[in-house]
Structures are given as C-alpha cells and as structure tokens.
C-alpha cells in the first residue's frame, strides 16, 4: 500500500494467486491515490468539514484548475493524488481524515484480501509508505476482518537486501 495498491497470495516459495489490480482510476483501494481521489473530490465539491477545507486551501493553495490540470493533463496523476498523505497524517485527529483512511483500507480488504480463500490461515504482510505510516489504522481494520498482520515494511528494498545478505548473494 503506497501510491497504488496490489496484493497476492504467497505460499512461502512462490506467488500462487493474485487478485487483479484495476489501477488508480478503478481500484487501488487502500492506496494514497485512492484516498487522494476521494479527498480531492470532496475538496472540489466543498464537502470537507469547513475547518479542514480551509486548512487544506491554506496549506496547498490549489485552485480547481490546478487540480484538474494535474489529474487530466500532467504525467502521473496517481502520484499527484497520492501526494496528500502527509496532510492526512498531520490531521489524523480529524474524523473525516480518520474515516477517509479506514474506509479506504476496508475497501482494500473487501476487494483484494478477502478474495483469497485461505487468507485467514496465514499472516498478512504489507509493504509501502501508506501501510507503514498508517500502521495503527491498518491493524485496526485488519482486526475488523479477523486477519492478522505479521509485518509492515516501508519499502521492499530493505527486505530484499536482508534476504541477499542472509543468503550471501550480495
């Protein structure tokens, strides 16, 4: 869970199942892009709580045209949409932000994780900045689904380096 999202079922030696990811436009539930899409839509429609609407406007100073240009005309709109995670972290005590994140995680569990038949037989592992920085909320939502998380890493590269060091391939 980072800019985007994906999942797979790994049996300890290979990936045996992979739920299709529909990308930032139709899917990426639980990701920064998914949260950003929902947040920015509410911002543009002025559906955010008033205090949060004003704080975001003050912090980012984006106009409607700036946002629409970034999403429809500039490269990597998913990265733009995911770029507001720091704002969410800074405003986590706001109920809207808390619900934005936990609802996005719930959608990830429903549309991705719950699709694996034997998912409750294995611990879950997550990689990505969104999973890492919102770890307590991810644990909370996984508990709602009676699922156990065993590891959350900010980046897969540290685990790859650890693997190669242990197996002396570096």
Where are these regions (language model features)?
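Phosphate-binding/catalytic loop of phosphoryl-transfer enzymes
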Residues: 1-54
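ATP-binding/phosphotransfer module of carbohydrate and carboxylate kinases, centering on a glycine-rich
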Residues: 40-170
């Amino acid at each position: 869970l980072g800019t985007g999202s994906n999942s797979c079922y790994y049996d300890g030696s290979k990936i045996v199942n992979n739920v299709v990811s529909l990308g930032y436009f139709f899917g990426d539930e639980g990701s920064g892009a998914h949260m950003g899409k929902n947040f920015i839509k509410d911002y543009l429609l002025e559906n955010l709580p008033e205090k949060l609407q004003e704080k975001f406007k003050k912090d980012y100073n984006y106009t409607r045209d700036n946002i629409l240009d970034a999403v429809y005309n500039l490269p990597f709109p998913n990265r733009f949409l995911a770029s507001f995670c720091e704002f969410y972290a800074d405003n986590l005590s706001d109920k809207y932000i808390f619900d934005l994140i936990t609802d996005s995680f719930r959608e990830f569990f429903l549309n991705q994780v719950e699709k694996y038949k034997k998912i409750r037989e294995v611990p879950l592992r997550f990689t990505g900045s969104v999973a890492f920085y919102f770890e307590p909320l991810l644990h909370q939502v996984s508990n709602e689904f009676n699922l156990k998380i065993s590891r959350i890493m900010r980046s897969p590269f540290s685990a790859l380096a650890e693997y190669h060091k242990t197996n002396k391939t570096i």
